[in-house]
A protein has these predicted regions:
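Residues that mark the junctions of alpha-helical repeat units in TPR/alpha-solenoid scaffolds
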Residues: 16, 54, 58, 91, ...
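Structural motif corresponding to the intra-repeat A-B loop/turn of tetratricopeptide repeats
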Residues: 30, 105, 138, 177-178, ...
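Alpha-helical repeat scaffolds
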Residues: 35-42, 73-87, 109-120, 142-153, ...
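Residue at a conserved register position within TPR or TPR-like alpha-solenoid repeats
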Residues: 102, 135, 155, 168, ...
Length: 350
């Protein structure tokens, strides 16, 4: 794009320094109304000058901010390269807000090159939280927990309970199956914070928290906690309820809550999803549909379950392998699948 010089107007006339502090503060405290209001206002003001140097860069930034916080659409990967290049061109507080969007886009896209991000000592609370995620992805869990403790103290003092819950949500990833007491303590902290400050926490942040903690509880086999969080998440009418559907089915079965499982697989909303999701879900539907019909169940075991196992991974693969072993014994079809079971066991996660 060929940009022009403007000798009639100064960018500072349009953008007082205070506006960038307000913008960063709104980002840190997740004030959607203010983020949308500020960005929309400056998109309109800068639009007539968007073909001029400096005006163009600010116009594009405000447009990306407005687009993300009004419709949750992130910049393209190509745009993130451009945003990174603006470090010494645009206001530093605006750059912090933009780099949060860059971080979100690149991690969601599976790009884990963190050399562009210097968040550890950032003046932005949201980006210091992003530094926690970087430490997690680098498997620096001890350093992550130490850093987390500092953030917890700071965010509590500043009454930023939205970002405090973000920190708790990330902290859960650091705990393994052998640290269930620590995870239970974290869940207690989360419940206390949500109960005390629920009116100040946007629905979307509560929804994200319920999903993330539920998935973390499921990961370390704390199925009762997982069920509690998943059920609350689904009750909020989340458009992404199918994300936790299979995990909830497995959690119900692991805790022998079969009536709840049957009720869940009959609900309409669980059928939203891609082919892989529905394939996994059909296992539970068919298992309980055919539980009194040995011939049909045997056919399903022999012809369908191996396909499910071959097309899943990690915890799902382990679960369906165990299910197949159990169902084969129940229906006396072990001989038909002995070779398959033996070969598959080598591919299971340790």
């Amino acid at each position: 794009m060929n940009l022009k010089f403007n000798t009639d107007y100064c960018i500072e006339e349009f953008l007082p320094t205070s506006i960038f502090s307000d913008l960063l503060n709104a980002c840190d405290y997740y004030n959607l109304e203010k983020l949308i209001s500020i960005s929309e206002s400056y998109v309109k003001q800068l639009n007539p000058f968007k073909e001029y140097i400096f005006f163009h860069e600010y116009y594009e930034c405000f447009k990306w901010i407005y687009t993300y916080y009004s419709s949750f659409e992130l910049p393209t990967l190509q745009s993130t390269e451009y945003i990174i290049s603006l470090k010494n061109i645009i206001n530093s507080n605006l750059y912090e807000v933009m780099m949060d969007l860059v971080f979100k886009k690149r991690t969601i896209s599976g790009i884990y090159d963190f050399s562009y991000f210097d968040f550890k000592n950032s003046n932005s609370m949201i980006n210091r939280g992003n530094h926690m995620m970087i430490l997690y992805n680098q498997s620096k869990l001890s350093e992550m927990l130490d850093y987390c403790q500092d953030l917890e103290e700071e965010y509590s003092i500043k009454n930023n309970y939205i970002r405090l819950l973000d920190i708790y949500s990330l902290k859960g990833f650091a705990f393994s199956n052998t640290e269930k007491e620590k995870f239970e303590k974290l869940v207690s902290q989360i419940n206390h914070t949500v109960e005390a400050h629920n009116s100040n926490i946007p629905k979307i942040k509560t929804s994200q928290l319920l999903k993330n903690i539920g998935l973390q509880a499921f990961r370390i086999d704390m199925y009762d906690i997982a069920i509690n969080y998943f059920e609350q998440y689904i009750a909020m009418d989340s458009p992404y309820a199918n994300i936790v559907g299979i995990d909830l089915c497995i959690s119900y079965q692991k805790t022998n809550k079969i009536n709840k499982l049957k009720s869940f697989i009959q609900s309409k909303e669980i059928y939203k999803g891609d082919g892989q999701y529905e394939n996994l879900l059909n296992y539970f539907i068919l298992k309980y549909k055919y539980q009194t019909d040995n011939d049909e169940l045997s056919y399903f075991i022999v012809n369908k379950v191996p396909i499910i196992i071959d097309n899943t991974m990690g915890k799902y693969k382990q679960f369906f392998y165990e299910e197949l072993s159990m169902l084969v014994e129940q229906t006396k079809r072990y001989k038909d699948l002995k070779t398959y079971l033996d070969s598959t066991s080598d591919m299971l996660p340790i």
